């Protein structure tokens, strides 16, 4: 729930209870109405926070509940009005919430200009749908950073048990910039008693980057590993469409650097879009350096970007092709990395096996890293089933509207599972995306 959702819900409660300041309004009927209204609002909040129900869907059910609990609903006139509305809303709710793996396939087919899909089975690439097109990676780029970390551990440049101060990580922490990922990681570290003297191990920092997608951990690792080393590694691997990497958190403030007092939002957007990649990434590097030295203190900062500025930021994220990440996944999945590096990267990537024990009943290996913004939804995953069959899946989806994003998030797990486990569905996907 965002700020406006909280304001709306709390506002309903406030205006429901406000009339009871007057004693004459405290009738039994009005009190019952208030209890129902407040109960429904609290139910909406709990559904969103505890059960991860989409806010709009929860509000829709709340609206239906209010109609059902209103005695006036059950007059003949109102029933004639409400029954068709209820049927329409029920159908729309079913369409939104039903499990529909085909939705992802249909979206790919209908939006080739904004979608890439890569699929390989036992080392053979069977789908390369717009897979050579560079698209924004969002947090999927963290796979490359994890790979460089694993290689530097292999080469004895770094030690996994090296201690890292949480103060050093906090230099790159901007509140509300990663969907609560960094806070979630810290909470788990505390629960598992892994914080000693305000320090954690380097390997746990890397796990926080992949498992929880902490942006602060990511930028810390970029500085530690060296951006030059990360970029050299991607070139060595032949990731031909992959941009050079630059810090993630500092890029959020590029608009503040470019903006002048006289500049309108439209002019600012024009200036940001006019920056070359080198100019844009240079500003990000300079800001990140100031964060590391403490010259730019994020502890007092808040982030407020309009949706239009978020779109520019999203479009200018580090980009690569689905082929690039298919190549990285094959290196990991087919054990083409040095022994220690392979062990390290698998330990990072295979968090779904560690957090969800049920996966062990179906797979020998399952590694995954996604990435998203308001407009982007990506995933890169490798799987080895109990029979030894190996699969690599990469999809990069851009220019999503809120409904598309919601439906893909809702159905992508079932799409991935069906693609891996259902031979007929796999054949259908291959046929539809290779015509």
What would you call each of these model-derived segments?
Residues 1-2, 28, 74, 195, ...:
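Juxtamembrane/transmembrane-helix boundary motifs in multi-pass membrane proteins
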Residues 10-84, 96-104, 111, 300-435:
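Structured C-terminal helix/loop/strand segments within mature extracytoplasmic catalytic/sensor domains
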Residues 84-92:
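Sec-dependent N-terminal signal peptides of Gram-positive bacterial secreted proteins and lipoproteins
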Residues 206-329:
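Mid-domain, small-residue-enriched loop/turn segments at the edges of structured enzyme/sensor domains
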């Amino acid at each position: 729930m965002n700020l406006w959702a909280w304001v709306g819900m709390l506002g309903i409660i406030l205006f429901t209870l406000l009339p009871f300041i007057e004693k004459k309004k405290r009738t039994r009927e009005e009190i019952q109405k208030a209890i129902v209204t407040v109960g429904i609002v609290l139910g909406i909040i709990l559904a969103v926070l505890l059960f991860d129900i989409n806010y709009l869907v929860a509000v829709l059910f709340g609206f239906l509940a209010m109609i059902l609990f209103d005695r006036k609903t059950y007059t003949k006139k109102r029933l004639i009005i409400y029954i068709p509305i209820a049927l329409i809303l029920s159908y729309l709710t079913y369409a939104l919430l039903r499990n529909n793996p085909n939705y992802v396939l249909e979206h790919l087919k209908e939006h080739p200009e904004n979608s890439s899909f890569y699929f390989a089975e036992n080392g053979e690439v069977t789908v390369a749908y717009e897979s050579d097109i560079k698209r924004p990676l969002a947090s999927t780029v963290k796979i490359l950073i994890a790979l460089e970390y694993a290689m530097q551990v292999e080469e004895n440049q770094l030690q996994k048990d090296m201690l890292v101060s949480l103060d050093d990580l906090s230099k790159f922490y901007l509140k509300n910039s990663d969907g609560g990922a960094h806070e979630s990681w810290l909470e788990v570290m505390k629960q598992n008693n892994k914080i000693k003297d305000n320090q954690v191990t380097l390997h746990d920092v890397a796990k926080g980057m992949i498992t929880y997608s902490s942006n602060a951990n990511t930028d810390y690792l970029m500085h530690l590993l060296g951006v030059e080393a990360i970029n050299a590694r991607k070139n060595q691997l032949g990731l031909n469409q992959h941009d050079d990497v630059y810090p993630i958190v500092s890029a959020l403030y590029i608009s503040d650097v470019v903006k002048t007092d006289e500049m309108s939002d439209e002019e600012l957007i024009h200036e940001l879009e006019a920056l070359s990649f080198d100019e844009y990434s240079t500003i990000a590097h300079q800001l990140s350096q100031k964060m590391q030295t403490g010259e730019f203190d994020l502890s007092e900062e808040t982030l407020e970007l309009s949706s239009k500025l978020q779109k520019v930021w999203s479009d200018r994220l580090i980009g690569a092709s689905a082929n690039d990440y298919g190549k990285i996944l094959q290196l990991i999945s087919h054990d083409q990395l040095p022994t220690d590096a392979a062990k390290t990267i698998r330990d990072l990537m295979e968090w779904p096996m560690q957090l969800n024990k049920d996966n062990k009943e179906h797979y020998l290996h399952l590694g995954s890293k996604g990435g998203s913004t308001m407009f982007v939804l990506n995933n890169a995953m490798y799987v080895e089933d109990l029979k030894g069959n190996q699969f690599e899946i990469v999809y990069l989806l851009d220019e999503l509207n809120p409904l598309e994003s919601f439906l893909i998030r809702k159905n992508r797990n079932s799409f991935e599972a069906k693609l891996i486990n259902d031979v007929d569905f796999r054949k259908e996907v291959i046929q539809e995306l290779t015509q």
